[in-house]
């Protein structure tokens, strides 16, 4: 039996925040954590500013692509993290894991745009990811 903890990061388009969280989790956890990402309404490509901001901190999401929700995966993972307030997801009744929502910083509400905005979003997600990785891997 595989006791490796697992997490699924979810946002609407799976082109930005959930991909960023997955890349950061892989960077911090390495092989100690199985990491997945998906979107409730997947887009067609990754957000270029997300890619660039993740690369700045030594993580890589360049091989990612927007994907939809896999109901079987949701049932198996230890944690499902919804990023932002927009994505809506209900856990299947027979799911094993815990659902949580991260209402992430949205600098555009303060008039901050472009790469400055994306770096702030990345740093907020990164702090949350580091805490989650520590929590999920402490007993693995």
From Swiss-Prot:
Q: Just give the chief location class.
A: cytoplasm
- What is the organism field in this record? Corynebacterium glutamicum (strain ATCC 13032 / DSM 20300 / JCM 1318 / BCRC 11384 / CCUG 27702 / LMG 3730 / NBRC 12168 / NCIMB 10025 / NRRL B-2784 / 534)
Similarity comment text for this entry: Belongs to the low molecular weight phosphotyrosine protein phosphatase family.
Name the keywords, alphabetized.
Arsenical resistance, Cytoplasm, Transferase
One GO molecular function term of this record is:
mycothiol-arsenate ligase activity
Q: Which Gene3D superfamilies match?
A: 3.40.50.2300
Q: What is this protein called?
A: Arsenate-mycothiol transferase ArsC1
Summarize the record's induction comment: By arsenite.
Locations listed in the record: Cytoplasm
């Amino acid at each position: 039996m595989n006791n490796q903890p697992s997490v699924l990061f979810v946002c609407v388009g799976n082109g930005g925040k959930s991909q960023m969280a997955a890349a950061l989790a892989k960077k911090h956890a390495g092989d100690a954590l199985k990491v997945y990402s998906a979107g409730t309404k997947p887009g067609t490509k990754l957000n270029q500013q997300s890619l660039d901001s993740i690369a700045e901190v030594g993580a890589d999401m360049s091989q990612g692509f927007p994907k939809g929700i896999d109901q079987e995966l949701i049932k198996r993972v230890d944690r499902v993290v919804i990023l932002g307030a927009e994505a809506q997801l209900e856990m299947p009744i027979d799911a094993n894991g815990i659902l949580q929502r991260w209402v992430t910083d949205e600098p555009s509400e303060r008039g901050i745009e472009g790469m400055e905005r994306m770096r702030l979003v990345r740093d907020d997600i990164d702090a949350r990811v580091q805490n989650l990785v520590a929590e999920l891997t402490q007993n693995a």
